Amino acid sequence: MGRYASGDLVLAPVRIGGGGERKVRPVVVIRGGERGSLLVCPVSSTPSSDGVSIPISLEDFASGGLDLFAESYVLAAHSATIQPADVAGKKGSLLPGTLAAIREAMTRLQRQAGHPP
């Protein structure tokens, strides 16, 4: 089990949209949670049709990155909670400004849904 920080891009099994099988995909660590859990947002090669998608490219990484030939998208509306033991590997870390944009999008979504940030 590793230690992961906000802004880390890791590989972990997540479900997008709540249905179907979990699939190992890149996810951005938004923050650590209770009992060591991690709040993450999945990354996809296509933007979400039902929520906010934040584009990321190689220029958004402080270190490492994805094998990107085109933009990828952080799916802010599909956050999930995982355990550090679920992480299959670390791919890199996002720049602080990129992480801030993702958090801002998540806060807007929570306010629209009537939940406090």
Q: What positions do the PLM features span?
A:
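Compact nucleic-acid interaction/catalytic patches
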Residues: 18-24, 29-64
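C-terminal terminal-subdomain/extension
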Residues: 63-117
